[in-house]
Regions:
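Bacterial N-terminal signal peptides that target proteins for export
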Residues: 1-9
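GH16 jelly-roll
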Residues: 20-232
Length: 232
C-alpha cells in the first residue's frame, strides 16, 4: 500500500512539473532577446509612433521599451507585430514583460489569427490595465458575430506587475488555449474551431474610453519587454 501511494505521489509531482513547463517537448521556432540597439525588421513591423520604441538597460542586457507619445488627445496604439513575418499554427507563445503602473492606458501581449476579420478568428491576450492589474482575455469573430471570453473572477492580486518582469504565456493546442503566468496556468478556453496560423503582437495603447483615467504627470509610464519566445 505504501509503495502504491508513493508511486501515486510521484505521478502527481511529475504531472505538476510538466504543467509548469508548457514548452516541454517543443522546439524553439521564433525568439528575440532585444539585446541590440534597434529592432530586427526581419521579425517585426511597427505601427504607431516609432519614436516610442526604445531600448533600455536591464541587468547585463537590454529590453525593448514601448512608451507613449505626448500629444493633445493622447489617443494612440503603438504596436510591434510579427504579422506577415512570422505566424504559426499551435504551440506555446511567451514573453517576459514589465507592465506599466498607472491607470488610463493598457499594455498587452497578444496572439491573433492572421486574417482576424474572417470568421472563425480569435485574438487572445494578457491585458495589463495599470494599478498592478493583469487579466487573460479573448475576443472571437464568429459567424454569429463577435464574442468575448473572460475569466469569471480575477486571476489573483498582484503587487509587482509594474515593478518586475513576469513571464506571460499562451499555450495553443487543437483543444483550445491555456494562459500561463510565471509558469502557472491561470485561465483556459476550450474552443476547437480556431485553426488558422496566429501571429504575435506587443502593444501599449490609450483608447478614448480610458483617456479620462490617464494622469499626464504620471508619465513616462512604460511597458518593457525583456524577451519573446515561441515554441512549436
Amino acid at each position: 500500500m505504501i509503495s502504491m501511494r508513493f508511486s501515486y505521489l510521484l505521478l502527481l509531482v511529475g504531472a505538476a512539473a510538466f504543467a509548469a513547463d508548457p514548452s516541454a517537448g517543443k522546439k524553439l521556432a521564433f525568439s528575440d532577446d532585444f539585446d541590440g540597439d534597434k529592432l530586427d525588421e526581419a521579425k517585426w513591423s511597427v505601427s504607431g509612433a516609432r519614436e516610442v520604441f526604445t531600448f533600455v538597460k536591464v541587468g547585463k542586457g537590454s529590453a525593448l521599451r514601448i512608451g507613449l507619445k505626448v500629444k493633445d488627445d493622447m489617443i494612440q496604439t503603438n504596436t510591434l507585430t510579427s504579422r506577415g513575418k512570422f505566424s504559426q499554427q499551435f504551440g506555446y507563445f511567451e514573453a517576459s514583460m514589465r507592465m506599466h503602473a498607472g491607470d488610463g492606458h493598457a499594455g498587452a501581449f497578444r496572439l491573433s489569427t492572421d486574417d482576424d476579420k474572417t470568421p472563425p478568428s480569435i485574438t487572445t491576450s494578457f491585458h495589463g490595465t495599470g494599478k498592478e492589474r493583469v487579466s487573460p482575455w479573448a475576443r472571437a469573430v464568429l459567424d454569429s458575430g463577435a464574442q468575448d471570453f473572460r475569466p469569471d473572477k480575477a486571476i489573483g492580486k498582484f503587487t509587482d506587475i509594474s515593478k518586475k518582469f513576469h513571464t506571460y504565456g499562451i499555450l495553443w493546442t487543437e483543444k483550445g488555449f491555456t494562459w500561463y503566468l510565471d509558469g502557472k496556468a491561470v485561465h483556459k478556453l476550450d474552443r476547437k474551431e480556431f485553426v488558422r496560423p496566429m501571429s504575435l503582437t506587443l502593444t501599449h495603447r490609450i483608447e478614448e474610453q480610458d483617456r479620462p483615467k490617464l494622469i499626464l504627470k504620471s508619465l513616462p509610464d512604460d511597458v518593457d519587454i525583456d524577451w519573446v519566445k515561441v515554441w512549436k
